[in-house]
């Protein structure tokens, strides 16, 4: 068996649908957004969208409509999922708790029936008498809306018109009436039918219209007074209502296809239309009042408003604000203005919502050499195409920044005796000290009486007896707060300079070379208590009081030069309690005693970014449990701060890190800043609960996230990225992308808009000796769109496009790899292409092109003609492995820098995906699932080891380990196949057994090994092995990791118990949702744990947790089973949340 845990690292971000109405209350205007399986509910306010609730559905949302039956005070929500679960939901709020109640539910799937090519359509009669569904060809399904029907019952009505394009209910009809566009061999037509609930039949409709435009694709039902319907085509817009027929063909809409629409006014006089290029139009219906007072339609008019993201759905909110939901790019809130701007646009973007979808390819790189992967994705398409850089970390939100180079330390002060909050920030520089006064959000430079400003400060702070202290290189100065004046000063007897110092509210320890002095702070007096000599110079020291020692520290921690040791000394005697040799030659730069979750620790950071941490016994001063992590490459400065009433440590370096404790384990979390040299906590009136941070040039004040999460940076390309790889030697990414150009009158083509490939710093164009350009069998015609493919070289630091290489006409770039070949020391970018002509069923020729990028130039080193499309390439033991149409081929790299075929494997339909491990090759086929090959180096050929004989249409594959292979297929499922080496017969050995099945509900485009969290930092007890990330069409990022059998069984038990306790929205069974489901079979999920469900344990109430753990057997690592407590499981689940 294979045991795996699958969990969401980033929820889907592509918007599939949106509706607006009064769902949370009759007064609230709501926006509801569907993102595949997730439903987000917002209230529209004057300030923008306010999130109310997010609901995870056990299903892909296919239909989402608000409606208000008679007798209801607010709207209800109808949802239909892709697995045909229908439900009617209501919003209920009591106090703080919000519930989404399932008023009615049922499954409306038919045993037989051919699912319609145009997808699922769901509509609701304007009078709320029924819901209509078009799920299968030739059938119209009706759900009557009775008052108190808990179960949704449906019946079918036969439709003679098999191929329905779109259907709507009409307004103002006595009986519910549908209007639809359908296609038959003669063309497309519009027809209406009345639906009789009693006879469960169609009656003849009020009107029909034969032979409408051949591309007519959308029906818009128009409310009264007009009534009737608008039909949207590729070139024309027509209005029908039986008596009246009006058609317009505005040239402006011909350029692209209109894909979505939304009514602006309740009376239907204005509609928004969005097309595939992201253009937004207004359709206006002009009225004419007749003598008898009736209103008829006088004219239709279309106006171009401007450009938005490419819309999947539009919804008009209020006051000229429109929500543009996008699947191919970021969604937007836009404002429609009365007057146009200089570019002639009436549209202004107000807010943008990040969307990673569709993730076409991605790679994990550790750009900052930090042991933490960043994910770089090829996201979006057409003008919305971009790269997204995704990393996990703690965010700092900048509130103010001041240009101040050279800061060497900073401290907050409360300058007045009775202040609760900080009002001053003291900054130290080489040879000087500056004081900033904080007044609200204003910052101004000031002077503090009693402080010196011509020396570098080592420490500054509020101390006991309403006093301030300033420790400089020359002396320790005690200053009274009221009035501000120097009351006591301590200098080293020979007036030597102080080199390091530490201070708490009533104690000071300073080091002068090898000497240590201990002072106590009394009212208006610094009293020297003791001093001692160490055998080496003191590099760092700390006297933070721990435990309940009344603010006094009985211990002093120091780090020494020369012998590179950390020591714990007793105060006041300076008696040595513990000496820890750190080893190596790098001196300790910062030392800190701190308490996390009531455990005491000593942290010691060295000058090379390494950090040692120990358990500290505050009674004896002994250190235990020595551990080491690497946090950066430069000297690290440790400072504590409090956030959410817990202690955290901020490690300042070239790779700032926050250290905190969870389940008595230290967690090291990246901060999304490039570099921090010094920091201090700041809690002022204008900047409450903030941090002040200094780097080489700037002082920043900001607040910190409570938890670590994914941070996403966008690099717009304005064209479609297809493939990405990283090349360390040149510090670049290679990206394959395509832009759309349009054929002009001269026979050439022009780009639609500037994009990455047209704006690169330098460019080149393929000229191939292999294909003469005249042999192209396909001539393009004027106005036709053509794809132009490029290899982009992108700088890893600035993400600037350094070079764009354009491929041949009709040449599609399909695969990309960066690797070394044979004994050749150079690293190459290698691209696989296909010559694509519309009249060919599959490509008959293509190229493999080897490029080298160095010193800012891209050179073509070699090219190889192949008889087909190069779908996939990987480096394989110093050779190049490629899949070309149905062939898997291995090339070796000769000393003449040419690719020479070594061996082939032919037994595939279309080999789309390749992954390798050692001498094993996993091949993913278009329709024949996966196949395992082994390369025999001695014979120089491939041997077919085993294959999965189930017909899975693959979308991505990955090797989990030597025996387990992960696949994703086109019905949104994951499966794991296992090689059965122990089988007795050859035939059994040749079968890959499907040992894991799971319905993900997402279309996976790419798998890759890697992790988004810091690797090997701190300790973990979760027994997960390996980490495979995946990216999907909806912009979801997920993770698959392997479990041991005992952990799998525990989590499976927990999963089953959670299903009994957590009520699903829409009353859909979890087991039904996660069951592996294709057109040919449905099987229960097995071998996979649903991590999203497991993690929801942390969100349920304590009593529900108790319900889950009742009688659950749990092995806490001692080998003995006992009954689990809620806290045991909280620990387990918190550990699991940390893997993503």
From Swiss-Prot:
An MF annotation (GO) of this entry: protein-containing complex binding
Pathway field: Protein modification; protein ubiquitination
Chain spans, region WD repeat beta-propeller B: 392-708
Biological process according to GO: apoptotic process; biological process involved in interaction with symbiont; cellular response to UV; DNA damage response; DNA repair; ectopic germ cell programmed cell death; epigenetic programming in the zygotic pronuclei; negative regulation of apoptotic process
Keyword DNA damage part of the UniProt annotation: yes
InterPro entries linked to this entry: Beta-prop_RSE1/DDB1/CPSF1_1st, Cleavage/polyA-sp_fac_asu_C, RSE1/DDB1/CFT1/CPSF1, WD40/YVTN_repeat-like_dom_sf, WD40_repeat_dom_sf
N6-acetyllysine: modified positions: 1067
A matching Pfam family: Beta-prop_RSE1_2nd
Family to which the UniProt record says this protein belongs: Belongs to the DDB1 family.
Function per UniProt: Protein, which is both involved in DNA repair and protein ubiquitination, as part of the UV-DDB complex and DCX (DDB1-CUL4-X-box) complexes, respectively. Core component of the UV-DDB complex (UV-damaged DNA-binding protein complex), a complex that recognizes UV-induced DNA damage and recruit proteins of the nucleotide excision repair pathway (the NER pathway) to initiate DNA repair. The UV-DDB complex preferentially binds to cyclobutane pyrimidine dimers (CPD), 6-4 photoproducts (6-4 PP), apurinic sites and short mismatches.
The record's note on its domains: The core of the protein consists of three WD40 beta-propeller domains.
PANTHER family: DNA REPAIR/RNA PROCESSING CPSF FAMILY (PTHR10644)
Name recorded for this polypeptide: DNA damage-binding protein 1
């Amino acid at each position: 068996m294979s045991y795996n845990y699958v969990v969401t690292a980033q929820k889907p971000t592509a918007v599939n649908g949106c509706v607006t109405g009064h769902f949370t209350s009759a007064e609230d205007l709501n926006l509801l957004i569907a993102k595949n399986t997730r439903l987000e509910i917002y209230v529209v306010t004057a300030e923008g969208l306010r999130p109310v609730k997010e609901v995870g559905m056990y299903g892909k949302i296919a239909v989402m409509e608000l409606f208000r039956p008679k007798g209801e005070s607010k709207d209800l929500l109808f949802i239909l999922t892709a697995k045909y679960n229908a439900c009617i939901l209501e919003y209920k709020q009591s106090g703080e708790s919000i519930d989404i109640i399932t008023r009615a539910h049922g499954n409306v799937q038919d045993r037989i029936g051919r699912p319609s090519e145009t997808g699922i359509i769901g509509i609701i009669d304007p009078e709320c008498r029924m819901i209509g569904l078009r799920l299968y060809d030739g059938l119209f399904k009706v759900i009557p809306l009775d008052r108190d029907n808990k179960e949704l019952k449906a019946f079918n009505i036969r439709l003679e018109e098999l191929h329905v394009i779109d259907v709507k209910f009409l307004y103002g009809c006595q009986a519910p009436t549908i209007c639809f566009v359908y296609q038959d061999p003669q063309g497309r037509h519009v027809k209406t039918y009345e639906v009789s609930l009693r006879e469960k039949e169609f009656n003849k409709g009020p009107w029909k219209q034969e032979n409408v435009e051949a591309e007519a694709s959308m029906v818009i039902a128009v409310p009264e007074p007009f009534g009737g319907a608008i039909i949207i085509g590729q070139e024309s817009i027509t209005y029908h209502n039986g008596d009246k027929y009006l058609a317009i063909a505005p040239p402006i809409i011909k350029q692209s296809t209109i894909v979505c629409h939304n009514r602006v006014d309740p009376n239907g006089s204005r509609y928004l239309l969005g097309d595939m290029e992201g253009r937004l139009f207004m359709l206006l219906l002009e009225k004419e009042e007749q003598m008898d007072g009736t209103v008829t339609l006088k004219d239709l008019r279309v106006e171009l408003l401007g450009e938005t993201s490419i819309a999947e759905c539009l919804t008009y909110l209020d006051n000229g604000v429109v929500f543009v939901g996008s699947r191919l790019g970021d969604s937007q809130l836009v404002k429609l203005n009365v007057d146009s701007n200089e570019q002639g646009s009436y549209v202004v973007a107000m807010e943008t919502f990040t969307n990673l979808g569709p993730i076409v390819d991605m790679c994990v790189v550790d750009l900052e050499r930090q042991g933490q992967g960043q994910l770089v994705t090829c996201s979006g398409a057409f003008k919305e195409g971009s790269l997204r850089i995704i990393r996990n970390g703690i965010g700092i939100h900048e509130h103010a920044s001041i240009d101040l180079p050279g800061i060497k330390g900073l401290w907050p002060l409360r300058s007045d005796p009775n202040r609760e909050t900080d009002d001053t920030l003291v900054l130290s520089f080489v040879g000087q000290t500056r004081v900033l006064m904080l007044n609200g959000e204003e910052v101004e430079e000031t002077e503090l009486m009693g402080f010196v400003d011509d020396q570098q400060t080592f420490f500054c702070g509020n101390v006991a007896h309403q006093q301030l202290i300033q420790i400089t290189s020359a002396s320790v100065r005690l200053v009274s707060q009221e009035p501000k004046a120097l009351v006591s000063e301590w200098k080293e007897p020979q007036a030597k300079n102080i080199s390091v110092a530490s201070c708490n509210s009533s104690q000071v320890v300073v080091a002068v070379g090898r000497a240590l002095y201990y002072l106590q702070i009394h009212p208006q007096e610094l009293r020297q208590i003791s001093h001692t000599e160490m055998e080496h110079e003191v590099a760092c020291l700390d006297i933070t009081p721990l435990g309940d020692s009344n603010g006094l520290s009985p211990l002093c921690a120091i780090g020494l030069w020369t012998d590179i040791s950390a020591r714990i000394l007793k105060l006041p005697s300076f008696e040595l309690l513990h000496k820890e040799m750190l080893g190596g030659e790098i001196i300790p730069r910062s030392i800190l005693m701190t308490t996390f979750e009531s455990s005491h620790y000593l942290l010691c950071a060295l000058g090379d970014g390494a950090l040692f941490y120990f358990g500290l016994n505050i009674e004896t001063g002994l250190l235990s449990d020595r551990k080491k992590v690497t946090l950066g490459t430069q000297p690290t400065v440790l400072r504590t701060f409090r956030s959410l009433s817990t202690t955290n440590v901020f490690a300042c370096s070239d790779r700032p890190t926050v250290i905190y404790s969870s389940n008595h384990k230290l967690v090291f979390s990246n901060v999304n800043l490039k570099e921090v040299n010094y920091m201090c906590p700041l809690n002022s009136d204008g900047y409450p609960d903030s941090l002040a941070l200094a780097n080489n040039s700037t002082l920043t004040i900001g607040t910190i996230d409570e938890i670590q999460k994914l941070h996403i940076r966008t690099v717009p390309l304005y064209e479609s990225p297809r493939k990405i790889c990283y090349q360390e030697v040149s510090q670049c990414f290679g990206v394959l992308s395509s832009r759309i150009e349009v054929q002009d009158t001269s026979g050439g083509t022009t780009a639609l808009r500037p994009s990455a490939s047209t704006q690169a710093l330098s460019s080149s164009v393929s000229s191939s000796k292999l294909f003469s350009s005249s042999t192209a069998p396909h001539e393009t015609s004027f106005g036709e769109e053509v794809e132009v493919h490029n290899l982009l070289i992108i700088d890893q630091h600035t993400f600037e496009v350094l070079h764009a290489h354009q491929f041949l006409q009709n040449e599609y770039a399909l695969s990309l790899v960066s690797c070394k070949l044979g004994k050749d020391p150079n690293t190459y970018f290698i691209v696989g292409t296909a010559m694509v002509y519309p009249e060919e069923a599959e490509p008959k020729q293509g190229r493999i092109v080897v490029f080298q990028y160095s010193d800012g130039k891209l050179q073509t080193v070699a090219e190889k003609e192949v008889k087909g499309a190069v779908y996939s390439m990987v480096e394989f033991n110093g050779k190049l492995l490629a899949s070309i149409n149905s062939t898997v081929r291995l090339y070796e790299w000769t000393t003449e820098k040419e690719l020479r075929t070594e061996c082939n494997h032919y037994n595939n339909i279309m080999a789309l995906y390749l992954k390798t491990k050692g001498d094993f090759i996993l091949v993913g086929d278009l329709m024949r699932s996966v196949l395992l090959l082994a390369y025999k180096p001695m014979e120089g050929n491939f041997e077919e080891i085993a294959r999965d004989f189930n017909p899975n249409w693959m979308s991505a594959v990955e090797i989990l380990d030597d025996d387990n292979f992960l696949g994703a297929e086109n019905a949104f499922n994951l499966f794991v196949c296992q090689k059965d080496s122990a089988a007795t017969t050859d035939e059994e050995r040749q079968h890959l057994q499907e040992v894991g099945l799971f319905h993900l509900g997402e279309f996976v485009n790419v798998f890759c090994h890697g992790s988004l969290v810091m690797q090997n930092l701190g300790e973990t007890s979760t027994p997960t092995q390996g980490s495979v990330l995946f990216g999907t069409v909806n912009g979801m990022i997920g993770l698959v990791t392997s479990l041991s059998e005992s952990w799998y069984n525990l989590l499976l038990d927990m999963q089953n118990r959670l299903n009994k306790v957590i009520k699903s929205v829409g009353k859909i069974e979890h087991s039904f949702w996660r069951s592996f489901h294709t057109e040919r079979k449905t099987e229960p999920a097995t071998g996979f744990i649903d991590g999203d469900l497991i993690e929801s344990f942390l969100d349920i109430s304590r009593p529900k947790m108790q319900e889950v753990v009742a009688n659950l057997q749990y092995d806490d690592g001692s080998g003995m089973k006992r009954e689990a407590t809620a806290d045991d499981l909280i620990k387990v689940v918190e550990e699991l949340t940390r893997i993503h």
